Swiss-Prot record:
Residues 23-467 are extracellular. Residues 489-503 are cytoplasmic. Glycans are attached at residues 63, 109, 139, 192, 196, 202, 221, 230, 235, 321, 328, 388, 438. One of its GO terms (cellular component) is membrane. Residues 1-22 form the signal peptide. InterPro entries: BDV_G. The record marks 249-250 as: Cleavage. Keywords: Clathrin-mediated endocytosis of virus by host, Cleavage on pair of basic residues, Fusion of virus membrane with host endosomal membrane, Fusion of virus membrane with host membrane, Glycoprotein, Host cell membrane, Host endoplasmic reticulum, Host membrane, Host-virus interaction, Membrane, Signal, Transmembrane, Transmembrane helix, Viral envelope protein, Viral penetration into host cytoplasm, Virion, Virus endocytosis by host, Virus entry into host cell. Glycosated; Stabilizes it. Residues 274-315 are annotated as: Fusion peptide. It comes from Borna disease virus (strain V). One of its GO terms (biological process) is fusion of virus membrane with host endosome membrane. The chain crosses the membrane at residues 468-488. This is Envelope glycoprotein p57.
């Protein structure tokens, strides 16, 4: 009996609904080992109006081209291991991985011991050092472009490759690895055009903006010159109107609320230079999430990056379907599953292999397309939450009255009833991260690197007592075996000489 059409349609709809519920969460998979894109954010174009203050300028610039170039990538690492053997049998080890920047022939694959013995008056320690060097040589393909950064690599950051290194055929990357390739000479064609630009008249210096380049340039005596573009504007002062004087305002009734200050500072909010300073100050120092600002500013949802002096350092990502896992560890970011592997989803929606620590019991509200609430170390997956989508009316008294629905309970006494928080200390719940003292390594993305803190595992009095008793038992057993070996031949000879004892 064949199934009916309505059954098939219903079954297909159910499968689609279940799949949508399963993959309702998405994360960004990003390759930050690749070369980032450097984009001038042009925050000065924030108040740019294409139809006002238009002037004609003569522009001469270099045409941009991109080619692929085969290369050989060489990466060498030196593995350093130093083992300390204590007098009582305990030991400790320091493991360090360093980048080797010498020649491949100089990267020896044999061990090199040093400091065979160290001893002083209170303990005796044997330190043995072993160093092994390994190199990986890979054939790769890179992209060379006529504008900086001149080289793009998907396996490493090639932003530091200069034009001279392109012509020499060898370059050292920022991570210490090297690239060898056929020497290449950059060549660009000069393009001359007459373009319409917009003069920003509310700036202290004359700035012309071109929509064709999405860039603005500061004019000095009507011209701008650089290695890649030359701009000459003849009538750059004729289209600007004189500035209006700001009116004196009554500042005696100003209060600290933002809605009271906003009308007073209306002229300041409209000033592009002040907005530029605010944006660069907030997002250029790492205080706020620069990736969220870059996505809104560049109108691209699948990028991450940071801002350095008005220039966005951006990586392209792609969205993948992930699912929450049980939050059973002391991690600040929630664990997620992607293709059977465990990752951590940070606040910017990016998948990471590492995460900061957090105290157990910390509740976190997160935004991943929807609001989610999860508790660190609870063993429960984060769940979606909803909120009342109404805004308050900007009056402090009514704002407090509308939200006065939480019982007034002492935070310290309330948290002391939680045994986990009490074990960590009642003051620790004020910090999102735990004060960890056992982390002596840092993940840099290319490998596990030890930062060189010494190890004192041999300073263990209980271990000394245990080893001393073990040595005493071992010595007693040896002495018993020696006495037994000495007495057995004598007893055999005595029995042979006297015979067996009889009544």
């Amino acid at each position: 009996m064949q199934p009916s059409m309505s059954f098939l349609i219903g079954f297909g709809t159910l499968v689609l609904v279940l799949s949508a519920r399963t993959f309702d969460l998405q994360g960004l998979s990003c390759n930050t080992d690749s070369t980032p894109g450097l984009i001038d954010l042009e925050i000065r174009r924030l108040c740019h109006t294409p139809t006002e203050n238009v002037i004609s300028c003569e522009v001469s610039y270099l045409n941009h081209t991109t080619i692929s170039l085969p290369a050989v990538h060489t990466s060498c690492l030196k593995y350093h291991c130093k083992t300390y053997w204590g007098f009582f049998g305990s030991y400790s080890a320091d493991r360090i991985i360093n980048r080797y920047t010498g020649t491949v022939k100089g990267c020896l694959n044999n061990s090199a011991p040093e400091d065979p013995f160290e001893c002083n008056w209170f303990y005796c320690c044997s330190a043995i050092t072993t160093e092994i060097c390994r190199c990986s040589i890979t054939n790769v393909t890179v992209a060379v472009q006529t504008f900086p950064p001149f080289m793009y690599c998907s396996f490493a950051d090639c932003s530091t490759v200069s034009q001279q290194e392109l012509e020499s055929g060898k370059a050292m990357l920022s991570d210490g690895s090297t690239l060898t390739y056929t020497p290449y000479i950059l060549q660009s064609e000069v393009v001359n055009k007459t373009l319409n630009g917009t003069i920003l008249c509310n700036s202290s210096s004359k700035i012309v903006s071109f929509d064709e380049f999405r860039r603005s340039y500061s004019l000095t005596n009507g011209s701008y010159q650089s290695s890649s573009i030359n701009v000459t504007c003849a009538n750059y002062t004729s289209s600007c109107r004189p500035r209006l004087k700001r009116r004196r305002r009554d500042t005696q009734q100003i209060e600290y609320l933002v809605h009271k200050l906003r009308p007073t500072l209306k002229d300041a909010w409209e000033d592009c230079e002040i907005l530029q300073s605010l944006l660069l100050g907030v997002f250029g120092t790492g205080i706020a999430s620069a990736s969220q600002f870059l996505r809104s500013w560049l109108n691209h949802p699948d990028i991450i990056g940071y801002i350095v002096n008005g220039v966005g350092v951006v990586w392209q990502c792609h969205r993948v379907n992930v699912t929450f896992m049980a939050w059973n560890e002391s991690t600040y970011y929630p664990p997620v599953d992607y293709n059977g592997r465990k990752y951590f989803l940070n606040d910017e929606g990016r998948l990471q292999t590492n995460t900061p620590e957090a105290r157990p019991g910390l509740k976190r509200v997160m935004w991943f397309g929807r609001y989610f609430l999860g508790t660190v170390g609870s063993g429960v997956k984060p769940r979606r939450i909803r909120y009342n989508k109404t805004s308050h009316d900007y009056h402090l008294e009514e704002f407090e009255a509308s939200l006065n629905m939480t019982p007034q309970t002492s935070i310290a006494s309330g948290h002391e009833t939680d045994p986990i928080n009490h074990a960590y200390g009642t003051q620790a719940d004020l910090l999102p991260y735990t004060r960890s003292s056992n982390i002596t390594s840092t993940d840099t993305g290319s490998g596990w690197v030890h930062i060189g803190l010494p190890s004192f595992a041999f300073l263990n009095p209980l271990g000394w007592l245990r080893d001393l008793l073990a040595w005493a038992a071992w010595l007693g057993g040896v002495l018993y075996l020696i006495s037994l070996c000495v007495s057995l031949p004598a007893s055999f000879a005595r029995r042979r000489r006297l015979g067996r004892w009889q009544e």
